[in-house]
Design a protein with these regions (language model features):
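PAPS-dependent sulfotransferase catalytic core
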Residues: 1-84, 227-228
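Glycine-rich phosphate-binding loop used to anchor ATP phosphates in small-molecule kinases
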Residues: 81-109
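Long, charge-dense
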Residues: 135-162
């Protein structure tokens, strides 16, 4: 039961949760850590909590509940969705690692529930992220709104209604990463690591793996970094660098100054 799990959460040893917008190599990282001794890595556990993640964003943004109350609500939802996985973790003595981006807005609740938990924030150049979202037709049909966060009052927000798809996906990038930045400010350095997916190399990968305290061989790292997973194909016109200047300006108005903070030129 969930009550039994709550009593044993202290036995869930050093779980790792990736926080991101998605489209940041989450499947790639789950594959990498699947070979690490003593770790059980998940890319898309079921339920994936996409709709619940949107609810988590909404309830925190609305501010209708006290922080403690909203965290309690979100803790119950998170545990209901991950009960069997966390129980497996402590009973089988394998560390839990989840790269699924749909737990991002549960970050505060997870940090409180699991004091041993570590978090990895992965960000990506907003132009590349938006290009990927466009390719997946985000915000072009109703189903997307159930899996991607939207402004709390989006149905009656004239600004949102007037946004192009590029502006909406840019907003998603900025809003998600801004939330994670605020969350990171509440944690000590030994619980959070930030990783730039757009400039990944062997050195930065070494640092990320060291932060998780996982054991992955040098041979495996070198092999993995050459692999590509869940990759989308683009025409030249679809690539951010070849966008019309107006589209780039629309993105920049929304994604700066955070993009500059990350060292991205947009």
């Amino acid at each position: 039961s969930v009550d039994e799990l709550k009593k044993n959460l202290h036995l869930v040893e050093r779980p790792v949760f990736f926080l991101s917008t998605g489209r940041t190599g989450t499947q790639w990282f789950a594959n990498l850590f699947s070979t690490a001794e003593g770790i059980k890595a998940y890319h898309a556990p079921s339920p994936d909590l996409a709709a619940q993640n949107c609810f988590a964003y909404k309830i925190q943004k609305q501010g209708k509940f006290k922080k403690e109350e909203s965290e309690e609500i979100l803790s119950h939802i998170f545990l209901a969705g991950r009960e069997q996985y966390l129980r497996y973790s402590y009973k089988c003595r394998r560390r839990y690692l989840e790269t699924n981006n749909h737990i991002t807005f549960f970050a505060y609740a997870i940090a409180d529930l699991l004091p041993q938990a570590k978090f990895i924030h992965i960000h990506r150049h907003p132009g590349d992220f938006v290009s990927s979202g466009l390719k997946r037709s985000w915000f072009l049909d109703g189903s997307s709104d159930k899996r991607q966060i939207v402004p709390v009052d989006h149905s009656s927000d004239p600004a949102w209604s007037s946004f192009t798809t590029i502006q909406k996906i840019s907003w998603l990038w900025n809003e998600t990463n801004s939330f994670v930045e605020s969350f990171k400010n509440t944690l000590p350095n030994d619980r959070i690591h930030t990783f730039d997916f757009s400039s990944m190399d062997l050195d930065s990968l070494h640092e990320l793996v060291a932060f998780t305290e996982a054991r992955i061989s040098e041979k495996r790292l070198k092999s993995q970094i050459t692999r590509r997973m869940n990759v989308q194909g683009y025409t030249e016109a679809e690539r951010y660098n070849n966008w019309p200047e107006k589209d780039k300006e629309d993105l920049a108005k929304i994604c700066n100054p955070l993009a500059r903070q990350y060292g991205y030129s947009i």
